[in-house]
């Protein structure tokens, strides 16, 4: 029996959002909840399954942090809220008139906990409206890439993302050509 050669499939580099795309999405969001969700996804780099399980009480407003209970491996990790995220999340929570403990709920009564599909659908609709390919995991990729490009060590990014292996983190971090050029000039040229 002959062995078949493995076909090499070129790996597509998945691009993060640009700052302009993030702002365009925010400006076209339907409501405060949607802005808060996008800010939260970016700030925490949380997986969508982790976000939909969160409750209001999980937010530590004093330290602007959240303990995420991971769906992968059931481990927990601490993530932080940017000032922008804390502002939009607080504004959203103040606008709610329900008693549901869930962090994110539907806009219409009876205000049920949002599921993965609801957030994915909201982002897909917003993406079609703005002509930007938008999905929850792209916010995670964007934050991890931004962290790498701003000089945060890979080991710290790995810990923040909840990855077991640095290789996994490296698949998320897209190094900018500008940073490569600057490093070359600083250390080599």
Regions found by a protein language model. Give the residues of each.
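Conserved catalytic core of the tyrosine transesterase superfamily
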Residues: 1-189
């Amino acid at each position: 029996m002959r062995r078949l050669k493995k076909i090499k499939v070129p790996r597509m580099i998945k691009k993060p959002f640009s700052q302009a795309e993030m702002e365009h999405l925010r400006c076209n969001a339907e409501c405060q909840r949607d802005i808060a969700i996008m800010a939260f996804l970016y700030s925490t780099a949380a997986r969508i399954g982790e976000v939909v399980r969160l409750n209001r009480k999980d937010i530590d407003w004093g330290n602007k942090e959240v303990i995420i209970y991971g769906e992968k491996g059931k481990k927990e990790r601490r993530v932080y809220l940017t000032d922008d995220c804390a502002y939009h999340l607080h504004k959203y929570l103040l606008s709610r008139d329900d008693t549901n403990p869930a962090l994110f709920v539907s806009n219409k009564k009876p205000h049920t906990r949002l599921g993965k599909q609801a957030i994915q659908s909201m982002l897909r609709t917003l993406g079609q409206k703005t002509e930007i390919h938008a999905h929850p995991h792209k916010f995670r990729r964007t934050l991890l890439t931004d962290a790498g490009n701003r000089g945060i060590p890979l080991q710290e990014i790995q810990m923040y993302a909840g990855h077991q292996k640095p290789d996994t983190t490296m698949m998320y971090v897209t190094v900018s050509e500008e940073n490569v050029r600057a490093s070359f000039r600083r250390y080599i040229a």
